[in-house]
Each structure stands twice: as C-alpha cells, then as structure tokens.
C-alpha cells in the first residue's frame, strides 16, 4: 500500500519552526551539504570538455579554432537542450520523494531517459551535417572540417548525457550527493588519462580529444547506472511502474520543454553576444575580451548552480511532503549563501582585475580591456547568482513556464536590444554588449524576486499534491 501524499488529515502542515526559532540555521546547514558537493560535481563535468580543448589547442591554431567552433555549436544545438529538459525531474522527482511516493521516482527517471534518446537521434543528424552547414554559413572550410569531425565524435557524449543527467537528478532528489561527487571526481581523473592517451600518445589530435569526452561520459554513465542498480540506498526508488510510463513521459515534456526554454534562451543569448562582437570595429580584440569575460562568468556560475540545485531539491521535497513553510525557509537559506559567495568572488575579481586577463592572454591591450570590464563582470556575478537561486526555486515549484517567459522578456525584449544599441549606436563596443547582459539579468532578477515574494506557499504544496495525484491517475 502506498504512503500518503500528505499527512492523514490531508491538510497542509503548518511549520511552527521559522527563521526566528533557528530553522534558518538548520536549513543553511542542509542546503550547504547539498550545494557544496553539487557545485563540485558541476565543476568536474564542466572541466571534461575544457581539458579536451586545452589539450587539442596545443596541436595548432587550426585545431583550437575548429574545436572552439564545434564546442559552441554543440552546446547551443544539443547539450543546452539536454540540460534544460532534465530540469523537469527537479520538480517531479523531488516532489515525489518528499511525498514518499518512491516508486514514482524510478518511473520518472526511466521515462526521462527513454524520452531523451529520440531527441538525441534528431540532434545527431544535425551534427552529422555540421561541416556542410558551417560552410554554408560562411565559415572557413578548414575550420569547418575540423569542427565537423570533432562534432561527429561528440555524438556518443550526447547519448551519455541522456543517461547521466536524469540519474544525477534522481540521486540529487534523494540527497545522495556524495556518490555523485565521488563518481564525478573519478571520471575527471579518468578523463585526464584517456585524453592524454588519445591525443598525445596515439596522436589522434582533436578527434582524440572528442573521443576522450565520449569515453569519459560513458564511464560516468556506467558507474552511476551500477550504483542506482545495486545500491541499497536506491532500493525503494529505482522501481519502474510500467502502467505509469506514458503519463510520466507526458509529465516529463510538460515541465521539460519550458525548463529547456529557460536554459536555452540564456545560453543562446551569450552566443549571440559573441556573434555581435565579431561585427564591431576591432573584432579580434572585442571577441577575445568578451570570450574571456564569458569564460570567467561561466566558471563562477557553477557555484550558484550548485546552490540552486540544493534549493530546488529542498523546495520540491518539502512541497511534496506538505511542509511549505520549510520550503520557504530553504529559499531564504539559498539567498543567504548567494549573498556570501557572490560578495566574496566579486571582491576577489575586482581586487585582481588588473592581472586576471594574463591568465588568458599576454596582450596588454586585452588585459587592460578585461580590467575595464571587471566592474560590470562583478555585477554579473551578483545578478547571475541571485537569478540562479530563484530559477532553482522555479524548478522546485514547477513553474518553469514563468521562468521561460521571464527570460524572453528580460534578455530578448530588453537586454539584447539595449546591448546592441549601446555597442553600435553609442559606440561602446564590447562594454555596451555586456551592459545589455547586465540589464537583462537585472530585469530577470526583479521579475523572479517579485514572483517569489508574492508566492502562496500553501497553494504550491497543494499543486504539488495535485501533480502527484494526476500522475497516479494517468493524467498529464
């Protein structure tokens, strides 16, 4: 017999403990215990392609240019979609675990993996023709050839993501972050050895770098799969209910599509930024500097992503359990962590603004330009961290559609036009483009803050219950 969705009286449980009675301190500890390992896991996953790019780059400028172009194209057309779709499981699996509907977690996870596979097939077809597509778009034929060859060998990585990402959310929803951490770090060490072997020892160049990513991600997928299959920690949650499969697929796409829109709209904006920088007066300088700023911002962003994943998990768990007040305190705890980390890294970046550019370039002009943009980059650190946490709240509650609409308004109706106007009409060049990003992030932050502050948490818990019941009854 199944566990009840909510307590016996079917009423939302009022939480007597609030931030006044120390609940905030308790939540800070719980969110931190999830956030730190998840941030580390995200960094480890981010470093896999970075290491391959670094190793391939030592084989010449052509190899580096081709790999960089392929990385950009595959991120936009494939990996962003995979990362976005799996955001639905933060809602579904997290709330199911909180409601003690453990068998639903396995069904949701297997449904997500099954749904991802045909999407990967469609994306793979696009990647197969990447070389011809890039040439038709006016890219250099030699660079396009390297990029196309690299993308072909990344196709297995795409299918590995179809397994890794749902299993990651499956474990995260249960708070099983330490196994994730161990497997991610092991995979990173494994990747370094494989990448060196294929690229340097066997002399496979950029193709070897791409193959190394594929081998490493499949290693990660297999280790996670074995843990989920054989670990006693997943005994209750790995079960599959076949009659719920179709309804779970519908639920996956219902929340996955707007979740993917949330992420893709943000990723695509930065690719648009780089494209626009190539149209400025000094395209080599502007593109180099904006690429450095984007890389720096991305490296920092993995930390707020870890906090957001933790907040999303706590919020979804507590809404599923019918304890909305604790979910609310989890949001406050996440914002406290955001304030500390964004302040620390912003101060650190500003203090070293005159030398950070040397980590990427020996050009004094580039280094000085990066230093000039550092105050804006510091502001991006603050805003990106804030929006990351609140986007985590959105995924935990299940209102990804609001997040997607917010990104359209903030980035494409406000941020991008402002950036293009400042860059070209006001001749602020790269600084103008980044100002547009900051303005867009500010609008996004304001809208998310208003929505979160006005949220009826008891109503969100009731919606979580209805979501689970509709899934049980085979409704989407």
UniProtKB/Swiss-Prot annotation:
Its main location: membrane. It is found in: Membrane. InterPro entries: MATE_euk, MATE_fam. GO terms for cellular component: membrane. GO terms for biological process: xenobiotic detoxification by transmembrane export across the plasma membrane. Keywords: Membrane, Transmembrane, Transmembrane helix, Transport. Coiled coil: none annotated. The chain crosses the membrane at residues 35-55, 66-86, 117-137, 154-174, 176-196, 208-228, 260-280, 289-309, 332-352, 370-390, 408-428, 433-453. GO terms for molecular function: antiporter activity; xenobiotic transmembrane transporter activity. It is a multi-pass membrane protein. Belongs to the multi antimicrobial extrusion (MATE) (TC 2.A.66.1) family. NCBIfam families: matE. This is Protein DETOXIFICATION 4. The gene is DTX4.
């Amino acid at each position: 017999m199944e566990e009840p969705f909510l307590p016996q009286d079917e009423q939302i449980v009022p939480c007597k403990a609030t931030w006044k009675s120390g609940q905030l301190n308790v939540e800070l500890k719980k969110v931190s215990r999830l956030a730190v390992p998840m941030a580390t896991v995200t960094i480890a996953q981010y470093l896999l392609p970075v290491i391959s790019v670094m190793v391939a780059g030592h084989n010449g400028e052509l190899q580096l240019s081709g790999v960089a172009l392929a990385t950009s194209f595959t991120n936009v057309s494939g990996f962003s979609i995979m990362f976005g779709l799996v955001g639905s499981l933060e809602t579904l699996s997290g709330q199911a675990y909180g409601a003690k509907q453990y068998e639903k977690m396995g069904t949701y996870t297997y449904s997500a993996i099954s749904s991802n596979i045909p999407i990967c097939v469609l994306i793979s077809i696009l990647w197969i023709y990447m070389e011809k597509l890039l040439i038709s778009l006016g890219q250099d034929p030699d660079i396009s050839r390297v990029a196309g060859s690299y993308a072909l060998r990344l196709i297995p990585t795409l299918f590995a993501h179809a397994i890794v990402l749902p299993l990651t959310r499956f474990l995260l929803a249960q708070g099983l972050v330490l196994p994730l951490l161990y497997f991610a770090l092991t995979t990173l060490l494994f990747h370094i050895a494989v990448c060196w072997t294929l690229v340097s020892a066997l002399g496979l160049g950029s193709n070897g770098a791409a193959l190394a990513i594929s081998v490493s991600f499949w290693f990660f997928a297999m280790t996670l799969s074995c843990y989920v299959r054989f670990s006693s920690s997943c005994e209750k949650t790995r079960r599959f209910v076949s009659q719920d499969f179709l309804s779970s697929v519908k639920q996956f796409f219902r929340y996955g599509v707007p979740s993917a829109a949330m992420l893709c709209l943000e990723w695509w904006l930065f690719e648009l930024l780089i494209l626009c920088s190539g149209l400025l007066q000094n395209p080599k300088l502007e593109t180099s500097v904006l690429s450095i700023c984007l890389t720096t911002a991305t490296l920092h962003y993995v930390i707020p992503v870890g906090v957001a994943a933790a907040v999303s998990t706590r919020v979804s768990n507590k809404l599923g359990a019918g304890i909305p007040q604790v979910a609310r305190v989890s949001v406050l705890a996440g914002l406290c962590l955001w304030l500390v980390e964004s302040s620390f890294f912003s101060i650190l970046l500003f203090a070293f603004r005159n030398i950070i550019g040397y980590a990427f370039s020996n050009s004094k002009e580039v280094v000085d330009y990066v230093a000039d943009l550092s105050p804006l980059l510091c502001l991006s650190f603050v805003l990106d961290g804030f929006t990351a946490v609140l986007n985590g709240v959105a995924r935990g509650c299940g209102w990804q559609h609001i997040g997607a609409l917010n990104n359209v308004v903030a980035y494409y109706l406000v941020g991008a036009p402002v950036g293009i106007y400042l860059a070209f009409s006001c001749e602020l060049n790269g600084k103008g483009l980044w100002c547009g990003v900051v303005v867009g992030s500010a609008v996004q932050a304001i809208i998310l803050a208003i929505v979160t502050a006005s949220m009826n948490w008891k109503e969100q818990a009731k919606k979580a219950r209805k979501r689970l019941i509709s899934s049980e009854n085979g409704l989407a």
